[in-house]
Amino acid sequence: MKRLYTLLSIALLALPALACTNLLISKGASKDGSVMVSYAADSHTRYGTLVFMPRATYPKGEMLEIREWGPGRYLGQIPQAEKTYNVIGNMNEHQVLIGESTWGGREEFTDSTAILDYGSLIYICLQRAKTAREAIEIFTSLADEYGYASSGESISFADPNEVWFMDIIGKKPKFNKKGKNVNKGAVWVAIRIPDGYISAHANCARITTFPKNAPENCLYAKDVISHAKECGLYEGDGSDFSFADT
């Protein structure tokens, strides 16, 4: 349907190694001008799963319990939004859609004190965002505030007008004498898929070099390059910095 986009939820049988695949199609690349994103999670534990979260309102001060997506491990609590949107599967009532694929990354960047894993962030964003850009902002700001409890991820964000692709990984923790991580959060880069193009990702970081002054088409963590330098992973002026190769 024109200007509406389609979610193609593909559940595949378990393979020897878990894998996810996302296919992203911009408006100009589809016959009827629809944005389309497919998300395949090759996991027997999620086969046939279709999440439903009804629209709701909450009293001020309500807290949201966070449990890791999949294992169900309790991670902590964050303030609940006063208003949330309907969510079915990986899409909400405003046709904001989020998919993912996991690529792991550096073990030393794991924050054992973090509260928000990627799965929880996906569904929190779907409950709160009206656009793909807003979902990116919510995802990254919450990760910075409460800590990112997952490994490296590629995330698809879409709405009826735009499709975005983001690579993200947690920052290397720095614990003070009280055991508090003073360097929580994540570093990330998000690229808008140009209209008329398609893209895909499957368990591999894909964003290499990226434009630094094009906010309509590229968003990124302000410390993505400086963090790599601090960790001894990059030397340079930033012009040749590649997220995926670092």
Placement of each model-derived feature along the sequence:
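A contiguous strand-loop segment
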Residues: 20-118, 138-246
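Sec-dependent signal peptide recognition
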Residues: 2-10
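N-terminal start-of-chain detector that recognizes signal peptides
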Residues: 10, 69-71, 127-129
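Second-shell loop/turn segments in exported
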Residues: 110-112, 120-129
